[in-house]
Amino acid sequence: MFLRFIEEVIKALGEYGDKKFLRESEHADLASTIAFKLAKERKKSPKEIADEIVENLEVESEYIGSVESVNGYINFFASYEFLEDTVNVILDEDENYGHLNLKGEILIEHTSANPDGPLHIGHIRNSIIGDTIARIFAKAGFDVKTHYYVNDMGRQTAITVLGIEKFGLKDKKPDHAVAEAYIEANKLLESNPELEEQVEKLMLAYEEGDEKTVEKFRRAVETALEGIKQTLKTINVEHDEFVWESEFVRNGYVGKVLGILEERGLVKKNGAWTIELEGFDKEVVLRRENGTTLYITRDLAYHMWKNENYERFINVLGADHKLYGAQLSKILELLGLKPPEIIFFEFVSLPEGSMSTRRGKFISADELISKVRDEAWKILSERDMEEDEKRKIADAVAVGAIRFDFIKIAPEKHMTFDWSKALDFERQTASYIQYSHARACSILRKAVEDGMPELEFKGELCTAGERKLVMLLSKMPYVVKRIVSELRPNVFAEYLLSVAGTFNDFYRDHPVLKAESEVRMHRLAIVDATRVVLRNGLELLGIEPLERM
C-alpha cells in the first residue's frame, strides 16, 4: 500500500515528482526534498520554492490527506481512506500480503561449504543470508531456485578420501565423522609429505572419471552432505539442488570455457594454463601442468551455465573471497558473460573469541544450535504448559534467535553472536517479535471467547499511535521491493522490529478488549492486521510465528 502512496505523491507533484527526492520522514508520511535541488538553480531559498510548489499543487488523490511546506520540505500525509484501505487489504490478502507481481527467474547460490566436515558458525551466516534473500525474492513474485555448489574436485576432498581410506568413518553424525578423517589425514600428510603424490593422483583420477575413484569421492562427499543437510534443516534452510562441480567437467562446459579463452588468445601455456587480468597483480591459473583444472575454472563453467538458464543470479560469499569474486567476474566479462551479483559477508565470532578452523578446533553450527536450544529450554521450562509444547516452543525460539541475530546485522559488518542477548525477550530479538505475534494472537483469542464482533477499522478514530502503526504495516511490500533492489536482508529485520515495537507501544497505550464497542472493533482490526504482518514477516525470515509462548 505504501508503494501506491508513493505513486500518488509522485503524480500529485507533477513536474516535481522525481522519485529520488522522496524520503521517509519522522515529520511526515513522505517528504520531498526537490526544493533544495531547485534552490541552487533558481537562486531562491528552499523554503520559498517549497511554499510555491505547495501553493500550486492540485491534489486529486483520495490517498493524500494533506500537504505542508516546512522549511523547504514538502510533507505529505496519508488520508483516512488510505489508512482504511491499508487495514482492509492486509486482512483480505492475509497470507499473500507483502506479495509483489514481479516476474523473472532467479538463482541464489549460498552456503556451498567444502564437504570435508560440519558447518561452522560462519557458514550458517552464509546460509541464513542466502535463504532469507530467497524467501524475500519468492514473496516478490520471482521464480526462485537455490543451489549449493558442491566442491567435490578440490584438494580437500581428495585428502578426505585419503583419510577415509586410512582411518575409516566413526559412528557419529556423518559430517563430523568425515571431519575426523580429514583432520587425521592432514596430520598424516604433515608427517609424511611423500603422500602428497597420492593426493594428486586421486585428484587426477577423479577428474579423468576413473570409475573406482569416482565411487570413493562420491561416497565421501555424500556422507558429508548428509550431515550438512541435517544441520541446515534444523535452522529451516533447504536447497532446491546440490550442484556438483564435477558435472561441468563431465558435461563439457569446462572444455568450452577453456576453448573460448584459448581461441581468443587470452591464455598463456607454459605447462600450466594461466590468464593475465588487467588490474590484478598475479596471473590466474586455470589448468595445472598435470591437466587438472582449478576451482575457478569449474566455477567459470558453472557461471556460463547460469548465464544460459537464469536472468539474474546471486552468490553469497565470505569477505575473504573478494579477490576471487573480482577475478571470476573479470574473466566472465572477457567471455562476454554476465558476472554474478555477490553479497559479501563478514565473519562471525563468539564473545569468547574467534573461530579456528584447521586442527579440529572450531565451533560447529551443531554445537551452537544445541547450546542455544538448551538455553531456550532453561528460560521456558518453568512455563505452565505441556512438556511437548514447551519443547516445540523452545526449539522455535532457539532457531529464531540464531536466524534473527545473524540477519539483523548488515552482511558487510563483522558480528559477534551472544546467545544470552539473542534470547532476551525484552531486547531487539526474534523472541521479542515472536512474543509480539503471540500477544496479538492472545488478544484475538480472548476477543473470540467474548464473542468478537465483525472487525471495522475507521480512519477517523485513529490516534497518533494507531496511525503510526498502520502506516508501518502499509510498508511491508515496499520493504520487500527495497531488498530485491538493494540485497540487504537486514533491512527487513529492522522493519519487523519496528512493527513489533510500535505494536507493543500501541497495546500499552490503548485498551483493546475493554474499549467501547466501535473503538473495540477498530482496535481489534489493527491487532489482526499487525498479526498478519508479523506472521508473514517472521516466515520471510525463516522463523516460526508462535501463537503461544
Swiss-Prot record:
<keyword id="KW-0648">Protein biosynthesis</keyword>
<keyword id="KW-0030">Aminoacyl-tRNA synthetase</keyword>
<dbReference type="InterPro" id="IPR009080">
    <property type="entry name" value="tRNAsynth_Ia_anticodon-bd"/>
</dbReference>
<dbReference type="GO" id="GO:0005524">
    <property type="term" value="F:ATP binding"/>
</dbReference>
<feature type="short sequence motif" description="'HIGH' region">
    <location>
        <begin position="113"/>
        <end position="123"/>
    </location>
</feature>
<protein>
    <recommendedName>
        <fullName>Arginine--tRNA ligase</fullName>
        <ecNumber>6.1.1.19</ecNumber>
    </recommendedName>
</protein>
<dbReference type="InterPro" id="IPR014729">
    <property type="entry name" value="Rossmann-like_a/b/a_fold"/>
</dbReference>
<keyword id="KW-0436">Ligase</keyword>
<dbReference type="Pfam" id="PF05746">
    <property type="entry name" value="DALR_1"/>
</dbReference>
<dbReference type="InterPro" id="IPR008909">
    <property type="entry name" value="DALR_anticod-bd"/>
</dbReference>
<keyword id="KW-0067">ATP-binding</keyword>
<comment type="similarity">
    <text>Belongs to the class-I aminoacyl-tRNA synthetase family.</text>
</comment>
<keyword id="KW-0547">Nucleotide-binding</keyword>
<keyword id="KW-0963">Cytoplasm</keyword>
<dbReference type="InterPro" id="IPR005148">
    <property type="entry name" value="Arg-tRNA-synth_N"/>
</dbReference>
<dbReference type="InterPro" id="IPR035684">
    <property type="entry name" value="ArgRS_core"/>
</dbReference>
<dbReference type="InterPro" id="IPR036695">
    <property type="entry name" value="Arg-tRNA-synth_N_sf"/>
</dbReference>
<dbReference type="Pfam" id="PF00750">
    <property type="entry name" value="tRNA-synt_1d"/>
</dbReference>
<dbReference type="GO" id="GO:0006420">
    <property type="term" value="P:arginyl-tRNA aminoacylation"/>
</dbReference>
<dbReference type="InterPro" id="IPR001278">
    <property type="entry name" value="Arg-tRNA-ligase"/>
</dbReference>
<dbReference type="GO" id="GO:0004814">
    <property type="term" value="F:arginine-tRNA ligase activity"/>
</dbReference>
<dbReference type="GO" id="GO:0005737">
    <property type="term" value="C:cytoplasm"/>
</dbReference>
<dbReference type="Pfam" id="PF03485">
    <property type="entry name" value="Arg_tRNA_synt_N"/>
</dbReference>
